[in-house]
Amino acid sequence: MDLDAITKHSASHAKPDGLILQYGTAGFRTKADRLDHVMFRMGLLAVLRSKQTKSTIGVMVTASHNPEDDNGVKLVDPLGEMLAPSWEEHATHLANAEEQDLARALVAISEEAAVNLHQDAFVVIGRDTRPSSEKLSESVIDGVTVLGGQFHDYGLLTTPQLHYMVCCRNTGGQYGEATIDGYYHKLSTAFVELSKQASCSGDDHRTLKVDCANGIGALKLKEMKHYLPQGLSVQLFNDGTKGKLNHFCGADFVKSHQKPPEGIEMKANERCCSFDGDADRIIYYYCDVDGHFHLIDGDKIATLISSFLKELLLEIGESLTVGVVQTAYANGSSTRYLEEVMKVPVYCTKTGVKHLHHKAQEFDLGVYFEANGHGTVLFSKAAEAKIRQLAKELEDKKGKAAKMLENVIDLFNQATGDAISDMLVIEAILALKGLTIQQWDALYTDLPNRQLKVKVADRQVISTTDAERQVVKPPGLQEAINDLVKKYKLSRAFVRPSGTEDVVRVYAEADSQENADSLAYEVSLAVFQQAGGVGERPQPGF
């Protein structure tokens, strides 16, 4: 390791004085003009991680659903999964090291992680469409090359596409071909094969309007359209030709504001969906004949997919386990429907994709979706082998069901949540089951809910257990919440500290919107009084 060369190169990627950043679930995110040093250093770290794992490592330059002026970076581990927690700590330490301490920090990481510095390293890089992304990705490459790493720059990619590339490169092509053409070919072939089983339906049923958040999803969906059959008509809106990234559009905007994005023309009962800025989240929605907006979030997506998978498994007579993984934010109606109607076991984890992904790996077929629309399905190696074997052996209805399951395996991006992949799965299932978006929405009715934030002096005064559904401290707060919940029908409430700011997040649901609002207000007040609230006291009616 040529520490002098690293120090020299680092001087042209100087760290702003006093800037401290934390590598979180989404990697690093902040204003784009504060990230040059972080990008250079993540190039260095990716090389060390590659040497340590003897694998290709990915670096994605994106800030997902954040405003266009922000940017960020995250590393992708060998099987396309998120960076290991111990290396998140290394990333934070390296990003925050002062200029004169950088060389020492690199040596410390190398020693602590037992990195063989003579091992070859290979890093792949992708970026979104933000104006700052190209220059920042060049800083990553500078970091990779100064440490002697080899690299391939894929240029513009969705985040899930980079995860796919990393997985392909580290599995000897077993997962697929590590090119953009390979990605489109794998997904489109599976979609075409799966859709062949659908009885013909009118064009109206197969038209989908997609809000691309003025992001990378638009470019990649345009490319993919050439691979898709005529039967699926996809109309793109907010495609980046005008309008800013994530500005009044995209999955996060639609979910948080509970209204359609700007820039999309919606007629009654038309099927619409939104991607987020880097195309790893998707949510569906429509307006009814009375003009009312209906949101179909990750909970309902998970319900549609898991019920379809269970039906196919019943058809082939296999006792493979299906599990659905949710967070405490999942609507209570979805949990009840899955457990009581579909008889599918549901498990709750802490908030954050890595927790859901990890839990989903415990099942033969693990379905996970956050309410925000980020999710996928994981198939165990044994389940995948069994399904592929049955697809060859079985005939008639059972054989057809096994082949459909095999196509579903290939259609999901098992490395991470992928808006394009999830969209194709959903469209295939709706066509196969002959469901309209209204019928899908009617599977169950969401309980009214309300989310609020309470400013506190120190968010660390609150600690939780039971997948963030119970407060452990301060003492007495959980008892107060329990007493408030008892006042309302079909109600529940929980509070959890924010991961990024000194606020406590409050979630409440009940049998009516009025009751959900009242419960959320009363719980907020309890938090304010017992957990060191600052500023204005919570008010009824917000």
From Swiss-Prot:
Needed co-factor(s): Mg(2+)
Enzyme class (EC, first level): isomerase
Record-level Gene Ontology MF annotations: magnesium ion binding; phosphoacetylglucosamine mutase activity
GO biological process, one term: UDP-N-acetylglucosamine biosynthetic process
Keywords, alphabetical: Acetylation, Carbohydrate metabolism, Isomerase, Magnesium, Metal-binding, Phosphoprotein
Family as reported in the entry's similarity comment: Belongs to the phosphohexose mutase family.
Protein name: Phosphoacetylglucosamine mutase
